[in-house]
């Protein structure tokens, strides 16, 4: 009986541990912007969760880093758990959904193409990237 009870408790604990795994989607809108949506596997919204975009290569310089990579943008998801924003100018980047220790996941983002450049210029002019402008636009 004791072994059975320990087994049941173990199974329940593992189900609880995986009940709210973080999820992220990074979709290419084809117009120089990306749609980022985050949430949890139990259906909870990612509203207010921090989004971090990093260059997809190791970095050991003076700029702020996350997981050993240079941060080029930090922001938060809106009330719908999403954000539509211009693609970073860097060729390779990764988007992190950072809901705290043990609740971090990431996905590589689509690169900006030459065909999207005109639309991207408009998107970057209207989207407020705040203090991250130089890093996002590589200026």
Positions of predicted regions on the chain:
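Sec-dependent signal peptide recognition
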Residues: 2-10
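N-terminal signal peptide c-region/cleavage motif recognized by signal peptidases
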Residues: 14-16
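Beta-strand-rich domain onsets/edges
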Residues: 18-39, 117-139
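Exposed beta-strand and adjacent loop surfaces of beta-rich binding modules
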Residues: 33, 48-50, 92-94
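A short beta-turn/strand-edge loop motif at beta-sheet boundaries
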Residues: 42-47
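Short amphipathic beta-strand segments in non-cytosolic proteins
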Residues: 50-74
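Glycine-centered loop-to-beta-strand initiation motif
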Residues: 67-87, 91
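Short, aromatic- and glycine-rich surface loops/edge beta-strands on solvent-exposed regions
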Residues: 89-103
């Amino acid at each position: 009986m004791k072994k059975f009870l320990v087994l049941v408790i173990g199974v329940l604990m593992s189900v609880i541990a995986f009940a709210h795994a973080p999820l992220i989607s990074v979709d290419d809108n084809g117009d120089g912007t990306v749609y980022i949506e985050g949430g949890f596997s139990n259906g909870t919204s990612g509203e207010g969760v921090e989004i971090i975009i990093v260059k997809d290569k190791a970095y050991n310089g003076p700029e702020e880093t996350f997981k050993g990579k240079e941060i080029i943008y930090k922001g938060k998801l809106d009330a719908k758990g999403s954000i539509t924003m211009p693609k970073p100018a860097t060729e390779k980047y990764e988007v992190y959904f950072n809901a705290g220790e043990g609740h971090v996941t990431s996905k590589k983002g689509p690169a900006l193409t030459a065909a999207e450049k005109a639309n991207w210029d408009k998107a970057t002019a209207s989207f407020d990237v705040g203090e991250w402008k130089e890093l996002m636009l590589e200026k």
